[in-house]
């Protein structure tokens, strides 16, 4: 017996026991103290599986209420089986009670009532109310994040970053969880960190020399996404490889050095122990402890215990400290000031704002709050886009330790100094200059390059001093004990370290512009001050380092870093829709839209032969001519181009929701064709490098996952994409010569730089991409130096580039090299016969749209007669069909293919092809008659006799709406489905339809191209 039945029986017995004349049952119930129903009940669906309910305390609650019960059941179900209850205890002095009922079915209606309980039993039920949980599609979890990118930092650390998936589901993403697996050891995934509220992190405590894969899940209010595609397998560094330095400010160590320490090397203390007093979030897995650092969290050393919190109302007393004046910084109009705030207390007592961290300042006493990399402003609350870092004397940026540099390295740095002293570079075995290290510092405007292989310091000093406010380039080179410093391509200065050790152990990050422990580096580097000024470029061992914050660039962390180009565009005046972009720390360019050029996009021009320049960040874009499904299994590009540099993207398109892409690049002088069907990348590379400054013909194609590449007359290269997928879908434009954002390209696309050079022809699946009509967007695309740019073709003729030269396609009525001669009915008016005999040159055609002509090349019957001569084995004589052709489109054609004369037609149910073999390309006149009656066809050529054929299927009518072409047609390969690749090379003297309808070839034509007079040449 349930609770309700028990109370019902109790009150029924009470009523029956009353003597005659006693009060009524209702009065008895009231006097018994039965509690009334809860009041003001409110219901609301929370999600797919839960609803919320709220009510007020009943009015008549003479006895104290000890609890409530919520009764709920699915509407329309068997109540005795489906009704469920949920008990709710009473809080102290609570007039309004709220509760959440979960574990429900999505999109289901529920009936809900509430009853209160007192010491005397259950009160009366509230009036039933209804609520419906949200439908399933309203409660979707996020899509799986994109495949994470992993960077190995050391033998026990990796840096991880990822991007959200295609959609965030039915609610915003709240957090991520990160998992790992060791493919060589583990069979299941291990969770490292849950509820991570950023898209990058650093994982510490990994096993050295071990393979790892990482995956990410996203979570919103409705649950977790599927696991992302696992990262590529990475291997942590081995003990003999680059040092195991930590990452970011958390790498700062307890100095353990008193202020009177002489900084000399202690042979017993060469291996520094790195310790963090304030531990990062950690998760224990077995006996292994993994610590996690996010890019948004910075930690001080053990003496500098950072408190990353907002200042309280009892604000700290800020002390004015006498700091030596620094030269005026070159800031843009809207640059963000870097506020490194100095306090008169240690980090143990200092409170720093969010996005900042505390470091004890041993030089001036007290402590400083430093802004994290990418943050600035007085409260470190402003975002800073860093490309050319600016340093203020207390700033620094960290990169991964120098790799493969223990024996030799080369570093090139371009900088502009605003103060005479400061540390530019440091990397070593310890944070404080003990043991092995290398450094570059400014000391009284001279550059000091120092390194120590473990038995003595080499000091190499530039012979000339730098000029403050001017740009300088310095190159450092070391091989074993020997070092070299070269400033501004001047005479190199050399030196040698002491002792016999010739290798350097690099464990710390590579610091640029300063170091968190610069105070302790004075003995090693010669200065305890940070650099003041800007850095424009940094190269290590011949590779340019992207100084943007990771994961876009290689900068792992930093403090109080500004952007040198900030405000550079404030005074720029880019017109005609141009936008400003910094290309150096102190200069900008205008990104001019198509059709404009110049310093400020002030010059309008007609784009003819596009010229792309890497220095101008050029690119153009054109949509795919047809829907993506037309290119799923087959794509072919023919490109004629002239490269001016050995690297750059020629063409690129991709799919935003998958791994699909295709790209054509210049790479080290070769052409690379890359494509991915979603299961692996295929890479085809030309056998020989291309000659720069010359025109080249390129053809690439892919059928399913098989690719072909051919450049000029080089050997054809074939290759195959990995995996089992065979289709490519690209939903973006086709980008030519560059892309708008190089951070968004697929990682295996090989796209690194814009193309420098010219492109004069692009044909996609036989369809020409026209520069004037098909380019829809782009920036800084100019005209190449080419004859077509000068519009040499007169009378409306169009210039067709042919590498260094050109050809003119002349309109009907004009001929000559530049369409300068008027012809047609007037050019040879002394020879009447010549007017009627047009000459075709392979890219010529005549077009007819007269209804009296068209009706004779359609319907149930057709009869055509021609007299022609030609010197080519291939060429189209006649064509009428749908444009563009579709599968089983109606058409009728007559032409030469490989020397044979072929009459073809399709009535909608299959193609009929009737062939006559012979020597028809002998330059002599030939007569051909093609007749069709329903499905049956016949062709007669000279005296060769008739050949007959029949089209398959049941269709008997030729239904066509297009024009009639004679001698060729526009984009012939495209519109004939590659049945013909060129027009007639020769002449046509007679053309008759329906046995007696004679057509004047030139006079009756509505349009034509490249028609000369037969016999004139």
Swiss-Prot record:
<dbReference type="Pfam" id="PF00008">
    <property type="entry name" value="EGF"/>
</dbReference>
<keyword id="KW-0272">Extracellular matrix</keyword>
<protein>
    <recommendedName>
        <fullName>Pikachurin</fullName>
    </recommendedName>
</protein>
<dbReference type="InterPro" id="IPR003961">
    <property type="entry name" value="FN3_dom"/>
</dbReference>
<feature type="disulfide bond">
    <location>
        <begin position="987"/>
        <end position="1014"/>
    </location>
</feature>
<keyword id="KW-0732">Signal</keyword>
<feature type="glycosylation site" description="N-linked (GlcNAc...) asparagine">
    <location>
        <position position="47"/>
    </location>
</feature>
<dbReference type="GO" id="GO:0005604">
    <property type="term" value="C:basement membrane"/>
</dbReference>
<dbReference type="InterPro" id="IPR001881">
    <property type="entry name" value="EGF-like_Ca-bd_dom"/>
</dbReference>
<keyword id="KW-0245">EGF-like domain</keyword>
<dbReference type="InterPro" id="IPR013783">
    <property type="entry name" value="Ig-like_fold"/>
</dbReference>
<dbReference type="Pfam" id="PF25016">
    <property type="entry name" value="EGF_Pikachurin"/>
</dbReference>
<dbReference type="GO" id="GO:0048786">
    <property type="term" value="C:presynaptic active zone"/>
</dbReference>
<feature type="domain" description="Laminin G-like 3">
    <location>
        <begin position="835"/>
        <end position="1014"/>
    </location>
</feature>
<dbReference type="InterPro" id="IPR036116">
    <property type="entry name" value="FN3_sf"/>
</dbReference>
<dbReference type="InterPro" id="IPR056943">
    <property type="entry name" value="EGF_Pikachurin"/>
</dbReference>
<dbReference type="InterPro" id="IPR050372">
    <property type="entry name" value="Neurexin-related_CASP"/>
</dbReference>
<keyword id="KW-0964">Secreted</keyword>
<dbReference type="GO" id="GO:0005614">
    <property type="term" value="C:interstitial matrix"/>
</dbReference>
<feature type="domain" description="Fibronectin type-III 2">
    <location>
        <begin position="144"/>
        <end position="239"/>
    </location>
</feature>
<dbReference type="GO" id="GO:0005539">
    <property type="term" value="F:glycosaminoglycan binding"/>
</dbReference>
<dbReference type="GO" id="GO:0042995">
    <property type="term" value="C:cell projection"/>
</dbReference>
<feature type="disulfide bond">
    <location>
        <begin position="371"/>
        <end position="380"/>
    </location>
</feature>
<dbReference type="GO" id="GO:0005509">
    <property type="term" value="F:calcium ion binding"/>
</dbReference>
<dbReference type="Pfam" id="PF02210">
    <property type="entry name" value="Laminin_G_2"/>
</dbReference>
<dbReference type="GO" id="GO:0031012">
    <property type="term" value="C:extracellular matrix"/>
</dbReference>
<feature type="domain" description="EGF-like 3">
    <location>
        <begin position="784"/>
        <end position="820"/>
    </location>
</feature>
<dbReference type="GO" id="GO:0098684">
    <property type="term" value="C:photoreceptor ribbon synapse"/>
</dbReference>
<feature type="domain" description="Laminin G-like 2">
    <location>
        <begin position="609"/>
        <end position="788"/>
    </location>
</feature>
<feature type="domain" description="Laminin G-like 1">
    <location>
        <begin position="386"/>
        <end position="564"/>
    </location>
</feature>
<feature type="domain" description="Fibronectin type-III 1">
    <location>
        <begin position="37"/>
        <end position="136"/>
    </location>
</feature>
<feature type="disulfide bond">
    <location>
        <begin position="569"/>
        <end position="580"/>
    </location>
</feature>
<dbReference type="InterPro" id="IPR000742">
    <property type="entry name" value="EGF-like_dom"/>
</dbReference>
<keyword id="KW-0966">Cell projection</keyword>
<dbReference type="Pfam" id="PF00054">
    <property type="entry name" value="Laminin_G_1"/>
</dbReference>
<comment type="subunit">
    <text>Interacts with DAG1 alpha-dystroglycan. Interacts with GPR158 and GPR179; transsynaptic interaction is required for synaptic organization of photoreceptor cells.</text>
</comment>
<feature type="disulfide bond">
    <location>
        <begin position="574"/>
        <end position="590"/>
    </location>
</feature>
<feature type="domain" description="EGF-like 1">
    <location>
        <begin position="343"/>
        <end position="381"/>
    </location>
</feature>
<feature type="disulfide bond">
    <location>
        <begin position="352"/>
        <end position="369"/>
    </location>
</feature>
<dbReference type="InterPro" id="IPR001791">
    <property type="entry name" value="Laminin_G"/>
</dbReference>
<dbReference type="Pfam" id="PF00041">
    <property type="entry name" value="fn3"/>
</dbReference>
<keyword id="KW-1015">Disulfide bond</keyword>
């Amino acid at each position: 017996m349930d609770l309700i039945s028990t109370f019902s029986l109790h009150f029924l017995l009470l009523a029956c026991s009353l003597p005659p004349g006693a009060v009524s049952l209702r009065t008895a119930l009231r006097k018994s103290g039965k509690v009334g129903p809860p009041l003001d009940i409110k219901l609301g669906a929370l999600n797919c599986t839960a609803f919320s309910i709220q009510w007020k305390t009943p009015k008549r609650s003479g006895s104290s209420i000890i609890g409530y019960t919520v009764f709920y059941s699915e509407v329309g179900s068997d109540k005795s089986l489906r009704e469920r209850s949920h008990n709710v205890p009473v809080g102290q002095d609570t007039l309004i009670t709220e509760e959440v009922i979960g574990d429900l079915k999505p999109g289901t209606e529920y009936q809900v009532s509430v009853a209160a309980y007192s010491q005397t039993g259950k009160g009366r039920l509230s009036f039933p109310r209804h609520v419906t949980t949200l439908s399933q599609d309203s409660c979707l979890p996020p899509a799986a994040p994109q495949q994470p990118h992993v960077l190995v930092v050391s033998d026990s650390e990796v840096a991880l970053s990822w991007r959200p998936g295609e959609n965030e589901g039915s609610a915003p993403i709240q957090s991520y969880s990160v998992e790992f697996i060791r493919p060589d050891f583990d069979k299941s995934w291990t969770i490292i960190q849950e509820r991570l509220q950023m898209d990058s992190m650093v994982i510490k405590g990994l096993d050295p020399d071990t393979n790892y894969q990482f995956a990410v899940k996203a979570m919103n209010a409705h649950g977790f996404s599927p696991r992302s595609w696992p990262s590529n397998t990475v291997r942590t560094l081995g003990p003999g490889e680059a040092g195991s330095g930590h990452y970011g400010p958390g790498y700062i160590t307890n100095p353990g050095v008193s202020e009177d320490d002489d900084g000399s090397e202690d042979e017993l203390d060469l291996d520094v122990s790195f310790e963090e007093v304030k531990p990062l979030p950690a998760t224990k897995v077995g006996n292994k402890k993994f610590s996690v650092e996010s890019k948004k969290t910075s930690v001080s050393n053990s003496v500098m215990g950072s408190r990353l919190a907002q200042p309280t109302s009892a604000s700290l007393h800020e002390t004015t400290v006498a700091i030596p004046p620094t030269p005026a910084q070159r800031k843009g109009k809207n640059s963000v000031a870097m506020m490194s705030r100095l306090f008169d207390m240690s980090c143990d007592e200092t409170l720093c704002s969010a996005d900042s961290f505390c470091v004890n300042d041993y030089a001036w006493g007290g402590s400083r709050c430093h802004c994290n990399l990418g943050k600035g402003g007085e409260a470190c609350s402003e975002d800073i886009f860093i490309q050319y870092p600016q340093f203020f004397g207390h700033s620094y940026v960290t990169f991964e330790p120098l790799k493969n540099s223990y024996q030799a390295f080369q570093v090139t740095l371009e900088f502009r100094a605003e103060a005479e002293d400061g540390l530019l570079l440091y990397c070593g075995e310890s944070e404080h200059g003990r043991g092995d290290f290398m450094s570059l510092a400014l000391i009284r405007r001279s550059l000091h390059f120092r390194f120590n292989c473990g038995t003595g310091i080499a000091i190499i000093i530039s012979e000339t001093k730098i000029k403050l406010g001017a740009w300088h380039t310095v190159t450092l080179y070391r091989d074993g004990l020997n070092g070299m410093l070269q400033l501004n391509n001047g005479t190199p200065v050399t030196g040698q370290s002491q002792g016999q050790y010739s290798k350097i152990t690099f464990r710390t990050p590579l610091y640029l512009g300063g170091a968190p422990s610069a105070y302790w580096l004075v003995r090693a580097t010669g200065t305890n001050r940070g650099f003041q000024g800007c850095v424009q470029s940094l190269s290590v061992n011949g590779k340019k380092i992207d100084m943007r914050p990771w994961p876009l660039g290689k900068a792992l962390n930093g403090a109080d870093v500004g952007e040198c180009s900030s405000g550079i565009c404030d005074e720029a005046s880019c017109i005609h829709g141009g936008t400003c972009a910094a290309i150096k720390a102190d200069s900008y360019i205008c990104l001019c839209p198509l059709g404009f050029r110049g310093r400020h996009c002030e010059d309008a021009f007609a784009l003819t032969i596009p010229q792309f320049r890497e220095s101008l960040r050029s690119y153009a874009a054109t949509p795919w001519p047809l829907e993506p499904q037309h290119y799923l299994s087959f794509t072919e590009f023919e490109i004629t181009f002239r490269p001016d540099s050995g690297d750059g993207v020629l063409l690129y398109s991709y799919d935003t929701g998958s791994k699909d892409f295709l790209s054509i690049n210049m790479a080290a002088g070769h052409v690379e064709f890359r494509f991915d069907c979603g299961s692996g990348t295929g890479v085809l590379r030309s056998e020989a490098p291309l000659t720069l400054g010359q025109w080249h013909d390129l053809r690439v194609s892919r059928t399913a996952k098989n690719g072909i590449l051919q450049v000029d007359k080089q050997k054809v290269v074939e290759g195959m994409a990995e995996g089992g997928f065979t289709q490519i879908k690209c939903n973006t434009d086709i980008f030519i010569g560059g892309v708008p954002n190089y951070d968004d390209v697929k990682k295996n696309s090989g796209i690194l730089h814009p193309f420098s050079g010219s492109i004069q022809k692009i044909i996609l699946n036989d369809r020409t991409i026209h520069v004037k009509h098909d380019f829809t967007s782009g920036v800084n695309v100019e005209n190449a130096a080419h004859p077509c740019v000068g519009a040499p073709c007169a009378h409306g003729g169009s210039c067709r580039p042919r590498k260094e030269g050109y050809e003119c396609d002349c309109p009907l009525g004009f001929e000559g090299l530049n369409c300068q001669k008027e012809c047609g009915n007037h050019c040879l008016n002394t020879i009447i016969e010549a007017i009627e005999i047009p000459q075709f040159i392979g890219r010529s055609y005549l077009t007819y749209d007269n209804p009296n002509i068209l009706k004779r090349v359609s319907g149930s019957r057709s009869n055509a007669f021609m007299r022609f001569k030609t010197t080519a084995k291939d060429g189209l004589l006649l064509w009428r069909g749908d444009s563009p052709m579709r599968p089983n489109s109606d058409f009728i054609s007559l032409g030469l293919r490989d020397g044979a004369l072929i009459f073809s037609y399709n009535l909608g149910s299959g193609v009929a092809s009737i062939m006559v073999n012979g020597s028809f390309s002998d330059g002599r006149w030939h007569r051909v008659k093609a007749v069709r009656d329903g499905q049956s066809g016949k062709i007669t050529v000279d005296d060769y006799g008739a050949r007959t054929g029949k089209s398959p299927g049941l269709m008997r009518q030729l239904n066509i709406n297009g024009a009639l072409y004679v001698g060729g047609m526009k984009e012939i390969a495209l519109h004939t489905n590659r049945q013909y690749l060129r027009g007639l090379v020769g002449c046509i003297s007679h053309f008759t339809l329906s046995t007696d309808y004679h057509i004047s070839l030139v006079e009756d034509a509505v349009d034509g191209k490249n028609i000369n007079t037969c016999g004139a040449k």
